[in-house]
């Protein structure tokens, strides 16, 4: 039987991109340092603990990391970059994904915020830039056009989405096709406790269209590991519960 470390030597193509990633990536919401609307959902981590987590991920074979503008108002991006540099990683050695926060904003803020994203993550480039959710004041068409513009300006490599329905995903893909670009991924909640994408058409459409599903909370934020059953006191340490 293959071991977990052996499995992480595998590289899978992300959608119809040239990005080759391990089957498991590391989500970096927990690097928010208590900032932002949901920054206190997690226990606040210091730089040393963040670097330890990143080191464990890298030593285990993980080669890609997912962060977002909304994670601590950019603190997660900064912490990720700092930690990777301290661990001796250079641009090109890891794959970086981040997300634009669309809530109550128009698509014009995609180009208006990209330089901050790049500054926070420097020297690492943005391999995948995602629309975090479908709650922008602008249409999907307008948002995707703005994202395509960033690709053509070489500020990002590829475009993804997150929390999009089947219809929204299909519209985003169609609009990107007009610019000659693929829609690489749709990042959605997916675990043994939440299998909605199997019934609502998202998973089926993604397979048909060559769009990778990036599953977030695949262990239901630790519930499926059994650790809360083994030690109920851990629940009290989670401010998000």
Model-derived regions: residue spans:
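Beta/alpha (TIM)-barrel catalytic core signal, keyed to glycine-rich beta->alpha loops juxtaposed to Asp/Glu
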Residues: 3-11, 134-241
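Short, well-ordered coil/turn segments that N-cap beta-strands
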Residues: 19-24, 61-64, 89-94, 123-127, ...
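Active-site mouth loops of central-metabolism enzymes
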Residues: 35-48, 100-108, 132-138
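A short, structured active-site edge motif that brings together acidic residues
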Residues: 92-104, 129-131, 187-190
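Active-site groove signature of glycoside hydrolases
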Residues: 121-137
């Amino acid at each position: 039987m293959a071991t977990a470390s052996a499995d992480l030597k595998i590289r899978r193509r992300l959608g119809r991109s040239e990005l080759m990633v391990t089957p498991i990536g590391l989500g970096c919401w927990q690097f928010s340092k208590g900032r932002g609307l949901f920054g206190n959902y997690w226990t606040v981590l210091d730089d040393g603990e963040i670097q330890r987590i990143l080191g464990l991920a890298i030593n285990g074979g993980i080669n890609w990391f997912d962060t977002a503008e909304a994670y601590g108002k950019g603190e997660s991006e900064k912490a990720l970059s700092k930690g990777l540099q301290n661990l001796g990683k250079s641009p090109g050695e890891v794959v970086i994904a981040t997300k634009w926060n669309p809530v109550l904003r128009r698509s014009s803020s995609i180009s208006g915020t990209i330089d901050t994203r790049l500054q926070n993550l420097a020297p690492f480039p943005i391999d995948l830039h995602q629309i975090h959710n479908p709650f922008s004041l602008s249409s999907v068409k307008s948002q995707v056009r703005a994202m395509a513009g960033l690709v053509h300006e070489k500020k990002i490599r590829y475009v993804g989405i997150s929390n999009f329905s089947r219809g929204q995903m299909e519209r985003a893909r169609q609009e990107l096709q007009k610019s000659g670009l693929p829609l690489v991924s749709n990042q959605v909640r997916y675990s043994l406790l939440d299998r909605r994408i199997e019934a609502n058409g998202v998973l089926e459409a993604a397979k048909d269209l060559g769009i990778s599903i990036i599953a977030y909370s695949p262990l239901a934020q630790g519930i499926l590991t059994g650790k809360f059953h083994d030690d109920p006191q851990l629940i009290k340490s989670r401010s998000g519960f």
